[in-house]
């Protein structure tokens, strides 16, 4: 549970911004969206496998030497 203490004479907008920032750092919004609907275990494995493959190809692409431009 995220708790934000509002300081004296602190505008509401600033406190709200701090609250949103802490929630984003904790990853609560992403977890909430993931748990909003039930996902079958097979679908979850498939999604995670696809994400791993995507990360792998992205890592390989970043390590490749750039082609010569001439």
Swiss-Prot record:
One example GO MF annotation: structural constituent of ribosome
Keywords: Ribonucleoprotein, Ribosomal protein
GO BP terms: translation
Annotated Gene Ontology cellular component terms: ribonucleoprotein complex; ribosome
Top-level taxon of the source organism: Bacteria
Keyword Ribonucleoprotein on entry: yes
Positions of transmembrane segments: none
Ribosomal protein in keyword set: yes
Signal peptide location: none
Similarity field: Belongs to the bacterial ribosomal protein bS21 family.
HAMAP family: Ribosomal_bS21 (MF_00358)
Entries under NCBIfam families matching the protein: S21p
Protein name per the record: Small ribosomal subunit protein bS21B
Organism: Burkholderia mallei (strain ATCC 23344)
Lineage, uppermost ranks: Bacteria, Pseudomonadati, Pseudomonadota, Betaproteobacteria, Burkholderiales
């Amino acid at each position: 549970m995220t708790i934000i203490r509002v300081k004296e004479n602190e505008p509401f907008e600033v406190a709200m911004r701090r609250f949103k920032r802490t929630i984003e750092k904790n990853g609560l919004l992403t977890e909430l969206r993931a748990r909003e609907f039930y996902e079958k275990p097979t679908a979850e494995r498939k999604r995670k496998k696809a994400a791993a493959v995507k990360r792998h190809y992205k890592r390989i692409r970043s390590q490749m030497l750039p082609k010569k431009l001439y």
